A protein has these predicted regions:
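Metal-dependent peptidase/peptidase-like ectodomains
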Residues: 121-123, 220-223, 230-231, 328-453, ...
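Second-shell loop/turn segments in exported
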Residues: 30-37, 51-60, 97-99, 131, ...
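Long, charge-rich, low-complexity alpha-helical segments
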Residues: 597-648
Length: 648
């Protein structure tokens, strides 16, 4: 393995260096125009506006954010600026997404009553993140009881929590049915922590954004506190001290709308302007939610401003295809849009998706250009990497020597090199929806990870680097503009980008010891995607053919409805329907492979179903992508999908 790692380093260095002078894919005049006009500062000023808003789905704060984006888009001269509204009443289904009702809050205070005096512990007015999403109104005075993680019945043994408030380390949604539903607790105080990184626990003042289960019958409230506060409370409880709390909450779900902001730069070609290249992000999340994901929202807005201005000034030609910009609530908004408006799904040929693209050094963020899933081969990811790899080299040369033609730094930003990584497919944002086999729209995914402040009170504008915003905007703008003009004249240049991408994929295959046949078929399919894109055909997910024999011969076909991934946002289509059909949870969903989790195996297993592959072939593809997985697990999951009416 040591030798493989060194080979990987050498090839990666070659692939990046080779993307140096001159700029790839676009004329240098176009690259210079983009570099000159894109502004990280303009993007950050817009970000500061969004970060003041608590942008929960369907809320007044989200609507204000949508209005802010729409107003800017109109001011920048974009066309067809709209705030689309789709009813969300808790009953309507948009594909695999059950529409969650809107949620709003006006008050949330948690205080301790002690010796006739009150001391405030948490205030929604001061920090909205302290009140868990989907909390319901309450006016409760009760003792606090420590239940550990709060997810296992044994943690409640010998404790009288009925009518009390429980202190738990798990997310409120994982606690509410057992604490409130089974044992009668009045509410929850949670100190749930972020996704684990090297910096976990380092800052015990972080307050994590919390969630209650939207569709749980056990309605309640939950407050989020820092690890520091939780430790103090736990120690007092350990010493048998009574802690008396008062919770005052005015909040709740109500029928509302999913709001999706959209705008366009119309294409110029009479035959191609009906096709669209979309820029995507997600507009929701807690205040401040600066990197996640005000950064993605304002960066695609900056791309829109820049392209519109340069086209209007004649510095860039109007693109042949229409360029569309979309600002939805995360995942559920995209799932709703593509199901409620199938004309959008039909017109969009490719997506540039941005989710967390501005994290400065304080966040410890690493910038990724993330490839698509193995089930949907496409050259568009290599296009994005061509620009990112070139910018890696330019920014490094500037950092190392002070001299570079295109360092793309911002006046208020840093001068560090970009150090972008071309990463294998990872899940967790709206790109999952686009690339689901229901829609099969390839999506470039630009994203930061890790970020030690994600989903917390400290994900603030102060941690956003304007240079990072400008560079992310450049990679996105250059990629989207190239694709919006792509024709047979660009095939040779795109093939050079594919060759560079293939080198890096070969390194990954060597390190993971991936079987050669699936990798070779994938590369042929990537090359074939050029012709599909140019012809206007919809990308096909069924290009790969396993070299393995079909020892498990059963073949499934996905039904036309429902469309979308099985797990969306705040709703698990598979789990809900499996319960109704009395189907046990398939083992695949809890499987941990070499390079993927059960969620990823399940996502791709469904994507690989095409009416041609056998269960054995799907297993082989999954093993090549995420590591060896037993055929029995895959076959069980496919049978379960058939059982809930997704496959036939």
């Amino acid at each position: 393995m040591r030798h493989m790692v060194w080979i990987g380093i050498s090839l990666a260095a070659f692939a990046t260096a080779a993307a140096g002078h001159p700029p790839p894919l676009l004329p240098e005049a176009s690259v210079a125009a983009l570099g000159d006009e894109l502004s990280g500062e303009t993007a950050k000023r817009n970000l500061e506006g969004l970060a003041r808003l608590h942008r929960q789905r369907g809320s007044r704060g989200f609507h204000s954010a949508a209005e802010l984006v729409a107003e800017r888009a109109r001011a920048y001269g974009l066309s067809d600026v709209q705030i689309l509204q789709f009813p969300a009443d808790g009953k309507i289904n948009y594909g695999t997404q059950r529409a969650r009702q809107a949620w709003d809050a006006t008050e949330g205070e948690l205080t301790e009553i002690r010796d006739g005096k009150s001391a405030k512990i948490a205030s929604y007015a001061a920090e909205p993140v302290v009140l868990a999403e989907d909390s319901e109104s309450a006016d409760v005075t009760a003792d606090l009881i420590d239940v550990g993680e709060g997810t296992q019945e044994g943690e409640y043994a010998g404790k009288d929590v009925k009518g009390k408030i429980v202190l738990a380390s798990a997310q409120p949604e994982a606690v509410q049915d057992i604490a409130v539903g089974k044992f009668g607790a009045a509410g929850i105080v949670s100190y749930a922590q972020n996704q684990r990184t090297a910096w976990s626990g380092e800052n015990d003042n972080l307050i994590r954004w919390g969630h209650l289960e939207t569709f749980s019958p056990n309605k309640t409230f939950a407050f989020m506190v820092s690890l520091k506060t939780a430790r103090l409370l736990k120690e007092r409880l350990r010493l048998k001290e009574s802690i008396h709390l008062h919770a005052a909450v005015e909040a709740g779900q109500h029928p509302g709308f999913y709001e999706v902001v959209t705008a366009t730069i119309p294409g110029s070609d009479s035959e191609l302007k009906g096709q669209e290249i979309a820029f995507s992000c997600h507009l929701d999340h807690q205040r401040p939610g600066a990197n996640d994901n005000a950064s993605g929202c304002v960066t695609i807005l900056e791309v829109a401003r820049t392209l519109q201005k340069l086209i209007g000034a004649g510095r860039l030609a109007r693109s042949a295809r229409t360029i569309r910009f979309i600002w939805p609530p995360e995942v559920e908004g995209t799932e709703t849009l593509l199901n409620a408006r199938p004309d959008y799904a039909k017109r969009i040929k490719a997506v540039v998706h941005m989710d967390m693209v501005g994290g400065g050094p304080e966040t410890k963020a690493v910038f990724h250009v993330t490839r698509g899933p193995l089930s949907l081969p496409s050259f568009i990811h290599d296009v994005a990497w061509a620009f990112a790899g070139w910018l890696n080299e330019e920014s490094y040369q500037f950092a190392a020597t002070g001299v570079a033609d295109y360092p793309l730094t911002a006046p208020e930003g840093g001068r560090e090199p970009l150090r972008a990584i071309y990463s294998s497919y990872t899940m967790g944002s709206d790109h999952d929806v686009y690339q689901d086999s229901s829609f099969a729209i390839p999506a470039i995914y630009l994203n930061d990870w890790p970020d030690r402040y994600i989903h917390t009170n400290l994900d603030s504008a102060a941690n956003i680097d304007t240079t990072k915003l400008k560079r992310a905007a450049f990679i996105g703008a250059a990629s989207g503009y190239f694709l919006a003009n792509f024709s047979s004249r660009d095939i040779a240049a795109a093939e050079r980008a594919i060759a560079m991408g293939q080198l890096l994929r070969a390194v990954t295959s060597m390190q993971r010891q991936t079987p050669a046949a699936p990798a070779a078929e994938y590369e042929r399919a990537v090359r074939g995607s050029l012709d599909e894109f140019n012809s206007g055909a919809r990308p096909r997910t069924q290009r790969l053919k396993s070299a393995a024999t079909a020892s498990a011969a059963i073949i499934y076909r996905r039904l036309q409805e429902p469309r979308g991934p099985m797990t969306v946002f705040g709703y698990d289509y598979f789990a809900d329907h499996a319960r109704s059909a009395a189907i046990a949870t398939p083992k695949l969903l809890n499987y941990e492979g070499s390079w993927g989790s059960g969620e990823e195996y399940a996502y791709e297993a469904l994507n690989f179903v095409d009416g041609r592959r056998s269960a054995q072939q799907i297993t082989d593809e999954l093993s090549a992508e995420y590591g060896p997985v037993p055929l029995a697990m895959v076959a069980e999951y496919l049978r379960a999908l058939k059982g809930i009416g997704v496959l036939e």
